[in-house]
Amino acid sequence: MLKFIQNNREITALLAVLLLFVLPGFLDRQYLSVQTLTMVYSSAQILILLAMGATLVMLTRNIDVSVGSITGMCAVLLGMLLNAGYSLPVACVATLLLGLLAGFFNGVLVAWLKIPAIVATLGTLGLYRGIMLLWTGGKWIEGLPAELKQLSAPLLLGVSAIGWLTIILVAFMAWLLAKTAFGRSFYATGDNLQGARQLGVRTEAIRIVAFSLNGCMAALAGIVFASQIGFIPNQTGTGLEMKAIAACVLGGISLLGGSGAIIGAVLGAWFLTQIDSVLVLLRIPAWWNDFIAGLVLLAVLVFDGRLRCALELNLRRQKYARFMTPPPSVKPASSGKKREAA
């Protein structure tokens, strides 16, 4: 049972999402509707994109805490270009390139300069946030064109164009990691770095690619953010890095690298977003959101740690069972046989 849970964390995350959807339905029947699903999905798109990028980095046994700042910086660039008269496609491409470049820089710091990921990205967190504030002068960017907002308008089955793009990206990333040698290189790099090198995996390049794609996903999240609310505050992206990491952990992505799946991270992002909608339904003040999300994450981390210890103990028992089995006892001869011998 323990091994099944460990190897199928996506199923447990899915069950948690379903329970969080069904249980509030007993309080309000209107909550059990397609409209609720589309609303939660629309709210979860930013976190889903960030969780997908964070998954790639965490699979390589690294962590990136700068994605919130990358999201804010890229959203600011998008707003500045649009207000300067550039077309939406040009502004979006430039925004994605900036995110890719920011992620690439993180990857270079970690893979080539050998700076620990948490230290490197803590530094770039402040760097990218500072660039964002220098560009805006601490002011909000408003007056964004209506065509940007159309990206988040319902298009088909109540899902926007960006929503469908996110679904396509999830499917593509799941296929890439599960079915291709390139995708399996991320797992190999995080599971055993030296072993992956001996197998011919270019581990430095894989880590740089992971950070670069993570930055690109953060840039796309910035585009989604700007299109959904129609303006860009000076604190855009603050705290999103922690939510992205939490979503991955909730979905079964190991902090030790080498295990997990994209679909688990997506379900973790959905779960965290759905908590907010349930709190609204229960009329709980919004300032409880982070507390409850943190409490849930802490519970999952404790459960994950205890589960890992139990599995390791069970594995050791199986490994040494044949050495611990006592030899069969020798039965004494019966008294009748003794008399015959006499």
UniProtKB/Swiss-Prot annotation:
GO CC terms of this entry: plasma membrane
Pfam families according to UniProt: BPD_transp_2 (PF02653)
Topological relation to the membrane, as annotated: Multi-pass membrane protein
A single GO molecular function term of this UniProt record: transmembrane transporter activity
Keywords on record: Cell inner membrane, Cell membrane, Membrane, Transmembrane, Transmembrane helix, Transport
Record's keyword annotation contains Protease: no
Transmembrane segments: 14-34, 39-59, 70-90, 93-113, 115-135, 155-175, 213-233, 252-272, 284-304
Subcellular location: Cell inner membrane
Topology, Cytoplasmic side: 35-38, 91-92, 136-154, 234-251, 305-342
Annotated S-S bridges: none
Segments in the Periplasmic topological domain: 1-13, 60-69, 114, 176-212, 273-283
Function of the molecule: Part of the ABC transporter complex LsrABCD involved in autoinducer 2 (AI-2) import. Probably responsible for the translocation of the substrate across the membrane.
Family: Belongs to the binding-protein-dependent transport system permease family. AraH/RbsC subfamily.
Assembly and interaction partners: The complex is composed of two ATP-binding proteins (LsrA), two transmembrane proteins (LsrC and LsrD) and a solute-binding protein (LsrB).
Protein name: Autoinducer 2 import system permease protein LsrC
Organism: Escherichia coli O157:H7
